[in-house]
Amino acid sequence: RRQRQMCIRDSRAALGVLRIILDAELDLPLDKAVTLTLEALGHGIVKDPTAIGTAVLDFFQDRMRVYFREEGFRTDQINAVLSRQPHQILDARKRLEALARFLTEHQAAEALAALIKRVNNLLRKENVEVQHDPDPQLFEDPAEHRLWEHWQVMAGPVHTHLQNAQYASALDLLAGLRPTVDTFFDKVMVLAENPEIRQNRLTLLTRLQDAFLRIADFTQLQGS
Protein backbone atom coordinates (compact mmCIF):
# COMPACT_ATOMS: atom_id res chain seq x y z
CA ARG A 1 0.00 0.00 0.00
CA ARG A 2 2.83 2.37 0.89
CA GLN A 3 4.50 1.67 -2.46
CA ARG A 4 1.24 2.37 -4.27
CA GLN A 5 0.87 5.68 -2.42
CA MET A 6 4.43 6.63 -3.39
CA CYS A 7 3.70 5.81 -7.03
CA ILE A 8 0.60 8.02 -6.92
CA ARG A 9 2.60 10.87 -5.37
CA ASP A 10 5.39 10.44 -7.94
CA SER A 11 2.85 10.46 -10.74
CA ARG A 12 1.18 13.62 -9.45
CA ALA A 13 4.56 15.28 -9.00
CA ALA A 14 5.58 14.41 -12.56
CA LEU A 15 2.30 15.73 -13.95
CA GLY A 16 2.86 18.88 -11.93
CA VAL A 17 6.30 19.34 -13.48
CA LEU A 18 4.88 18.86 -16.97
CA ARG A 19 2.08 21.34 -16.24
CA ILE A 20 4.58 23.95 -15.05
CA ILE A 21 6.70 23.51 -18.19
CA LEU A 22 3.66 23.93 -20.44
CA ASP A 23 2.05 26.81 -18.53
CA ALA A 24 5.34 28.72 -18.47
CA GLU A 25 6.06 27.71 -22.09
CA LEU A 26 9.54 26.55 -21.12
CA ASP A 27 11.58 25.14 -23.99
CA LEU A 28 13.12 22.56 -21.68
CA PRO A 29 14.36 19.21 -23.04
CA LEU A 30 13.57 16.60 -20.39
CA ASP A 31 16.58 14.46 -21.29
CA LYS A 32 18.94 17.38 -20.73
CA ALA A 33 17.22 18.33 -17.47
CA VAL A 34 17.51 14.78 -16.14
CA THR A 35 21.17 14.54 -17.15
CA LEU A 36 22.05 17.84 -15.45
CA THR A 37 20.18 16.81 -12.31
CA LEU A 38 22.01 13.50 -12.06
CA GLU A 39 25.35 15.23 -12.66
CA ALA A 40 24.57 17.70 -9.89
CA LEU A 41 23.82 14.86 -7.48
CA GLY A 42 27.20 13.31 -8.21
CA HIS A 43 28.37 9.73 -8.66
CA GLY A 44 28.64 9.22 -4.92
CA ILE A 45 24.87 9.42 -4.58
CA VAL A 46 23.84 8.05 -7.98
CA LYS A 47 25.55 4.72 -8.61
CA ASP A 48 24.24 4.11 -12.12
CA PRO A 49 23.23 7.47 -13.63
CA THR A 50 22.62 6.02 -17.10
CA ALA A 51 20.13 3.42 -15.89
CA ILE A 52 18.43 5.87 -13.55
CA GLY A 53 18.26 8.53 -16.27
CA THR A 54 16.62 6.08 -18.66
CA ALA A 55 14.10 5.01 -16.01
CA VAL A 56 13.23 8.62 -15.17
CA LEU A 57 12.74 9.53 -18.83
CA ASP A 58 10.57 6.45 -19.39
CA PHE A 59 8.48 7.49 -16.39
CA PHE A 60 8.06 11.02 -17.73
CA GLN A 61 7.17 9.61 -21.15
CA ASP A 62 4.31 7.68 -19.57
CA ARG A 63 3.18 10.79 -17.69
CA MET A 64 3.30 12.82 -20.92
CA ARG A 65 0.98 10.30 -22.54
CA VAL A 66 -1.42 10.56 -19.59
CA TYR A 67 -1.27 14.35 -19.65
CA PHE A 68 -1.95 14.61 -23.37
CA ARG A 69 -4.80 12.09 -23.19
CA GLU A 70 -6.36 14.21 -20.45
CA GLU A 71 -6.08 17.17 -22.81
CA GLY A 72 -8.21 15.25 -25.31
CA PHE A 73 -5.65 14.02 -27.84
CA ARG A 74 -6.02 10.56 -29.35
CA THR A 75 -3.61 7.86 -28.24
CA ASP A 76 -2.41 7.16 -31.78
CA GLN A 77 -1.72 10.86 -32.33
CA ILE A 78 0.27 11.01 -29.10
CA ASN A 79 2.31 7.96 -30.10
CA ALA A 80 2.92 9.41 -33.57
CA VAL A 81 4.30 12.64 -32.11
CA LEU A 82 6.27 11.24 -29.18
CA SER A 83 8.04 8.78 -31.45
CA ARG A 84 9.54 11.82 -33.20
CA GLN A 85 9.80 14.24 -30.27
CA PRO A 86 10.03 12.34 -26.98
CA HIS A 87 11.73 14.90 -24.73
CA GLN A 88 10.50 18.45 -25.38
CA ILE A 89 6.95 18.54 -24.08
CA LEU A 90 6.21 22.09 -25.27
CA ASP A 91 7.28 21.24 -28.81
CA ALA A 92 5.42 17.92 -28.62
CA ARG A 93 2.18 19.70 -27.72
CA LYS A 94 2.63 22.12 -30.65
CA ARG A 95 2.99 19.11 -32.94
CA LEU A 96 -0.05 17.42 -31.40
CA GLU A 97 -2.21 20.51 -31.77
CA ALA A 98 -1.15 20.87 -35.40
CA LEU A 99 -1.65 17.17 -36.17
CA ALA A 100 -5.08 17.00 -34.51
CA ARG A 101 -6.20 20.13 -36.37
CA PHE A 102 -4.84 18.78 -39.65
CA LEU A 103 -6.68 15.47 -39.30
CA THR A 104 -9.91 17.23 -38.31
CA GLU A 105 -10.02 20.16 -40.71
CA HIS A 106 -8.41 18.91 -43.93
CA GLN A 107 -10.58 16.75 -46.15
CA ALA A 108 -7.48 15.21 -47.67
CA ALA A 109 -5.82 14.47 -44.32
CA GLU A 110 -6.83 10.83 -43.83
CA ALA A 111 -6.15 9.96 -47.48
CA LEU A 112 -2.80 11.72 -47.34
CA ALA A 113 -1.89 9.92 -44.11
CA ALA A 114 -2.73 6.63 -45.84
CA LEU A 115 -0.50 7.60 -48.76
CA ILE A 116 2.38 8.39 -46.40
CA LYS A 117 1.93 4.96 -44.82
CA ARG A 118 2.10 3.45 -48.29
CA VAL A 119 5.29 5.38 -49.03
CA ASN A 120 6.80 4.26 -45.73
CA ASN A 121 5.96 0.62 -46.41
CA LEU A 122 7.55 0.81 -49.86
CA LEU A 123 10.72 2.40 -48.54
CA ARG A 124 11.01 -0.03 -45.65
CA LYS A 125 10.44 -3.03 -47.91
CA GLU A 126 13.10 -1.82 -50.33
CA ASN A 127 15.43 -0.78 -47.49
CA VAL A 128 16.04 2.62 -49.07
CA GLU A 129 18.64 4.92 -47.53
CA VAL A 130 19.61 7.92 -49.64
CA GLN A 131 21.47 11.15 -49.02
CA HIS A 132 20.82 12.87 -52.34
CA ASP A 133 18.00 14.20 -54.51
CA PRO A 134 16.41 12.23 -57.35
CA ASP A 135 17.80 12.71 -60.85
CA PRO A 136 15.16 14.34 -63.09
CA GLN A 137 16.99 12.93 -66.12
CA LEU A 138 15.79 9.49 -65.03
CA PHE A 139 12.11 10.45 -64.85
CA GLU A 140 10.05 8.65 -67.49
CA ASP A 141 6.54 9.87 -66.73
CA PRO A 142 5.21 13.45 -66.56
CA ALA A 143 3.76 12.59 -63.13
CA GLU A 144 7.29 12.16 -61.79
CA HIS A 145 8.31 15.58 -63.08
CA ARG A 146 5.18 17.22 -61.66
CA LEU A 147 5.67 15.71 -58.22
CA TRP A 148 9.34 16.71 -58.08
CA GLU A 149 8.60 20.24 -59.35
CA HIS A 150 5.73 20.62 -56.88
CA TRP A 151 7.96 19.47 -54.03
CA GLN A 152 10.78 21.83 -55.03
CA VAL A 153 8.40 24.79 -54.93
CA MET A 154 7.16 24.02 -51.43
CA ALA A 155 10.30 22.50 -49.87
CA GLY A 156 11.76 25.87 -48.83
CA PRO A 157 8.61 27.22 -47.15
CA VAL A 158 7.95 23.86 -45.47
CA HIS A 159 11.51 23.78 -44.11
CA THR A 160 11.14 27.34 -42.78
CA HIS A 161 7.88 26.50 -41.01
CA LEU A 162 9.43 23.40 -39.45
CA GLN A 163 12.50 25.33 -38.29
CA ASN A 164 10.17 27.80 -36.55
CA ALA A 165 7.99 25.05 -35.04
CA GLN A 166 5.07 26.24 -37.18
CA TYR A 167 3.79 22.73 -37.67
CA ALA A 168 0.23 23.66 -38.63
CA SER A 169 1.48 25.88 -41.45
CA ALA A 170 3.83 23.14 -42.64
CA LEU A 171 0.99 20.61 -42.72
CA ASP A 172 -1.25 23.05 -44.58
CA LEU A 173 1.38 23.25 -47.32
CA LEU A 174 2.01 19.50 -47.35
CA ALA A 175 -1.73 18.87 -47.74
CA GLY A 176 -1.46 20.55 -51.12
CA LEU A 177 0.66 17.65 -52.34
CA ARG A 178 -2.24 15.22 -52.21
CA PRO A 179 -3.48 15.56 -55.85
CA THR A 180 0.06 15.37 -57.24
CA VAL A 181 0.89 12.34 -55.11
CA ASP A 182 -2.37 10.66 -56.14
CA THR A 183 -1.51 11.16 -59.81
CA PHE A 184 2.01 9.86 -59.24
CA PHE A 185 0.75 6.58 -57.79
CA ASP A 186 -1.93 6.28 -60.49
CA LYS A 187 0.52 6.76 -63.36
CA VAL A 188 3.89 5.52 -62.10
CA MET A 189 5.03 2.01 -61.25
CA VAL A 190 7.38 2.81 -58.39
CA LEU A 191 9.06 -0.59 -58.32
CA ALA A 192 10.23 -0.51 -61.92
CA GLU A 193 12.25 -3.41 -63.29
CA ASN A 194 15.17 -1.11 -64.07
CA PRO A 195 16.99 -0.80 -60.71
CA GLU A 196 18.25 2.71 -61.47
CA ILE A 197 14.74 3.96 -62.30
CA ARG A 198 13.30 2.19 -59.25
CA GLN A 199 15.92 3.71 -56.93
CA ASN A 200 15.30 7.16 -58.37
CA ARG A 201 11.56 6.91 -57.78
CA LEU A 202 12.07 5.69 -54.24
CA THR A 203 14.50 8.55 -53.66
CA LEU A 204 11.80 10.99 -54.76
CA LEU A 205 9.39 9.47 -52.25
CA THR A 206 11.91 9.76 -49.42
CA ARG A 207 11.77 13.54 -49.77
CA LEU A 208 8.05 13.48 -49.01
CA GLN A 209 8.46 10.97 -46.20
CA ASP A 210 11.20 13.03 -44.54
CA ALA A 211 9.03 16.14 -44.42
CA PHE A 212 6.15 14.36 -42.71
CA LEU A 213 8.47 12.50 -40.32
CA ARG A 214 9.84 15.80 -39.09
CA ILE A 215 6.42 16.38 -37.54
CA ALA A 216 5.10 12.95 -36.59
CA ASP A 217 5.26 9.28 -37.52
CA PHE A 218 2.14 9.04 -39.66
CA THR A 219 2.40 5.25 -39.79
CA GLN A 220 1.19 5.15 -36.19
CA LEU A 221 -2.09 6.89 -36.97
CA GLN A 222 -5.06 4.56 -36.85
CA GLY A 223 -7.50 6.64 -38.88
CA SER A 224 -10.81 8.02 -37.82
Regions found by a protein language model. Give the residues of each.
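Amphipathic alpha-helical "coupling" segments that flank catalytic cores
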Residues: 1-5, 9-224
